[in-house]
From Swiss-Prot:
One of its GO terms (cellular component) is chloroplast. Keywords: Chloroplast, Plastid. Belongs to the ycf33 family. It holds the Pfam family DUF751. It comes from the Eukaryota. The keyword Plastid applies. This is Uncharacterized protein ycf33. InterPro entries: Uncharacterised_Ycf33. It comes from Trieres chinensis. It is found in: Plastid, Chloroplast.
Length: 64
């Protein structure tokens, strides 16, 4: 029974480390794109437009 609780208490640490690894894998291509000056502008505009689009969709969905 002690092994069971040991494994249960290890789960949050595994979950957090998995999420951090996933974020690093997803964001590493964008880090490489920031090294090129022309692409830096497009990446910033894309991220800005993405978040603005999400914002306007959520505002219209909730009716605020």
């Amino acid at each position: 029974m002690n092994d069971f609780w040991t494994n249960v208490f290890r789960y949050p640490r595994f979950f957090i480390s998995s999420l951090i690894g996933l974020l690093l894998v997803i964001l590493s291509p964008f880090k490489n794109l920031f090294k090129i000056a022309k692409l830096r502008i497009f990446v910033i505009l894309f991220i800005l437009l993405f978040f603005l689009g999400i914002y306007f969709v959520l505002v219209n969905m909730t009716g605020l």
